[in-house]
C-alpha cells in the first residue's frame, strides 16, 4: 500500500495503530508461551525516516521492552536520502542503535529520476556516506529498480559506474511492477513513451551484472551483489545466506515476522503472509 502524505498528524495516527498491532502480536505470543529469538530488525516500507527523531526512538524503545535485543545482529532503517543528513544517520546509530542502512536509490540517472518524480542527485549520497557514517554501519545497501521509464543501456551503465564509485557493501535488484490500479501515480510514467519491455529489461540486468562484477562485486544471490568481506558475502561463503520476506538475509534464521501496512512475513518455507 502507498499513501503520499505531508501531514505529520497522519503519521502519528499510523504509529498509534502500529503500536496496537504490536501489542496484539505480543499478547498472542505471550499467551502461547512463545519467546522470540530475534537476530534481525528491519524498518522498511516507504521510508521510516519520515518519523521524527523522537518517534523513531519511541518505536525502538517499544520493541526493546518486548523482547531480548541482545541477539540482534543487524538493525536496519530504510532511509530516503532526501529526508536524512549525516547528523540524522549518526543519531539513528548512536541513540537508536541502527547499524545497517538501506537506500532505495532506484536509479542515479537524472532523466530517469525526472520521469518518476524522484529527484535525488548523486551528491546527496556523497554527502551522506562520509567516513564517519561508513565506520558506524556494518552494511550499506543500495536498491536498484529495473524497468523504469527512460532507462537505457547507456544510462544504466553510468548509474552502475556511480554505484561502484559510491561503494555500498550490498546492491540488490528488483523489477518494477507497473500496477497503476494500486499506485495511481504510475500512470504518468507512460506520458513520454513505453516502459522497457522484457528483452530490454533483460539487457539492463546483463549490463548491471557485467558492470558490478568488473567493479569487484560478488553475486551472492539471484538479485544480490556484495563486496568481498561484507556481511552478505561472509554469510554466502558460510552457507548462511537465505532469501526472506525483505530480500536476502544473513544468518541462519528463516522466520520473518512483520507488522504494519504492506508488511510481509514468512515462517520457514511453509507460510507467507502479506
Model regions and ranges:
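C-terminal scaffold of the Radical SAM
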Residues: 3-28, 36-274
Amino acid at each position: 500500500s502507498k499513501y503520499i502524505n505531508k501531514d505529520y498528524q497522519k503519521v502519528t495516527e499510523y504509529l498509534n495503530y502500529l503500536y496496537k498491532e504490536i501489542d496484539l502480536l505480543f499478547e498472542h505470543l505471550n499467551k502461547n508461551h512463545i519467546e522470540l529469538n530475534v537476530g534481525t530488525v528491519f524498518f522498511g516500507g516507504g521510508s521510516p525516516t519520515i518519523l521524527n527523531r523522537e518517534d523513531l526512538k519511541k518505536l525502538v524503545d517499544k520493541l526493546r521492552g518486548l523482547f531480548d535485543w541482545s541477539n540482534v545482529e543487524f538493525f536496519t532503517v530504510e532511509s530516503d536520502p532526501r529526508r536524512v543528513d549525516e547528523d540524522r544517520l549518526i543519531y539513528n546509530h548512536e541513540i537508536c542503535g541502527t547499524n545497517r542502512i538501506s537506500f532505495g536509490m532506484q536509479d542515479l540517472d537524472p532523466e530517469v529520476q525526472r520521469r518518476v518524480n524522484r529527484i535525488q542527485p548523486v551528491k546527496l549520497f556523497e554527502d551522506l556516506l562520509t567516513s564517519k557514517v561508513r565506520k558506524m554501519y556494518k552494511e550499506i545497501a543500495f536498491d536498484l529498480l529495473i524497468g523504469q521509464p527512460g532507462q537505457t543501456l547507456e544510462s544504466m551503465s553510468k548509474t552502475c559506474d556511480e554505484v561502484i564509485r559510491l561503494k555500498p557493501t550490498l546492491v540488490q535488484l528488483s523489477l518494477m511492477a507497473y500496477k497503476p490500479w494500486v499506485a495511481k501515480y504510475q500512470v504518468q510514467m507512460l506520458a513520454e513513451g513505453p516502459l522497457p519491455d522484457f528483452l530490454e529489461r533483460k539487457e539492463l540486468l546483463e549490463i548491471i551484472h557485467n558492470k558490478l562484477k568488473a567493479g569487484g562485486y560478488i553475486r551472492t544471490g539471484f538479485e544480490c551483489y556484495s563486496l568481498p568481506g561484507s556481511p552478505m558475502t561472509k554469510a554466502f561463503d558460510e552457507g548462511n545466506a537465505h532469501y526472506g520476506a525483505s530480500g536476502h538475509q544473513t544468518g541462519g534464521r528463516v522466520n520473518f515476522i512483520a507488522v504494519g501496512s504492506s508488511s510481509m512475513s514468512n515462517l520457514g518455507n511453509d507460510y507467507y503472509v502479506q
